[in-house]
Amino acid sequence: MQAFTTLDGLVVPLDRANVDTDAIIPKQFLKSIKRAGFGPNLFDEWRYLDHGEPGMDPATRQPNPAFVLNLPRYAGASVLLARDNFGCGSSREHAPWALEDYGIRAIIAPSFADIFYNNCFKNGILPIVLDAAAVDRLFGECEASAGYRLKIDLEQQTVTTPGGEVLRFEVDAGRKHRLLNGLDDIGLTLLQADKIKAYEARRRQEAPWLFA
């Protein structure tokens, strides 16, 4: 998993509350368990005017010119600005996979659905909770200024605006450690590899019939 330390990223504003995981990545794209390849179908039903199915070439589809991800000024954005209860709905881990595959490294919102919030940390995305008033200000600044960027420092737990405003956010120490060091669940387990090997060796001595 890619580590997250600091980010100076272009912001894309998604001004909708209660964005659920089916909107983030529709159910017909959930057949694959590979983490890569979901980016072209992120927000598929909003992003395109035609109905998407697995295997369709995005280059041949009809984009929705009004959807924010299709506006040239937001091309290459790595910070998603969202509203309340982002990531609600089913617990599909494909949702953060699609966001990460598109290039989103951080999401800022007043609140997140719990399971989605947890899944972000497991997939290299930093979900940042800021109060609604601060998020409102960021939306206003972003929509008023092309090329709007935010600087995010996970170690210091800060978001800095182009005008110099510093917004502080909270993050669990364990989750922070995971992101700073690029550790997913497998990576965390491998940190204990020596202890696991020692335990298995001891169990072979204590209960050899289990390994027969």
UniProtKB/Swiss-Prot annotation:
SUPFAM superfamilies cross-referenced by the UniProt entry: LeuD/IlvD-like
Q: Which Gene3D superfamilies does the record match to this protein?
A: Aconitase, domain 4
Q: Which reaction does it catalyse?
A: (2R,3S)-3-isopropylmalate = (2S)-2-isopropylmalate
Which pathway does it serve? Answer: Amino-acid biosynthesis; L-leucine biosynthesis; L-leucine from 3-methyl-2-oxobutanoate: step 2/4
| UniProt EC number | 4.2.1.33
Write down the top EC class of this protein: lyase
* GO CC annotations on file: 3-isopropylmalate dehydratase complex
Residue ranges of coiled coil: none
> InterPro entries of this UniProt entry?
3-IsopropMal_deHydase_ssu, Aconitase/3IPM_dehydase_swvl, AconitaseA/IPMdHydase_ssu_swvl, IPMI_Swivel, LeuD
- Write one Pfam family the protein is assigned to: Aconitase_C
Function as written in the Swiss-Prot or TrEMBL entry: Catalyzes the isomerization between 2-isopropylmalate and 3-isopropylmalate, via the formation of 2-isopropylmaleate.
Cite the PANTHER family for this sequence: 3-ISOPROPYLMALATE DEHYDRATASE SMALL SUBUNIT, 3-ISOPROPYLMALATE DEHYDRATASE SMALL SUBUNIT 2-RELATED-RELATED
The record, for HAMAP family, names:
LeuD_type1
Instruction: Tell me which family the UniProt entry assigns to this protein.
Output: Belongs to the LeuD family. LeuD type 1 subfamily.
Question: Subunit structure of this entry?
Answer: Heterodimer of LeuC and LeuD.
Give the protein name, as stated in the record.
Answer: 3-isopropylmalate dehydratase small subunit
The species is Thiobacillus denitrificans (strain ATCC 25259 / T1)
- Tell me what gene encodes this: leuD
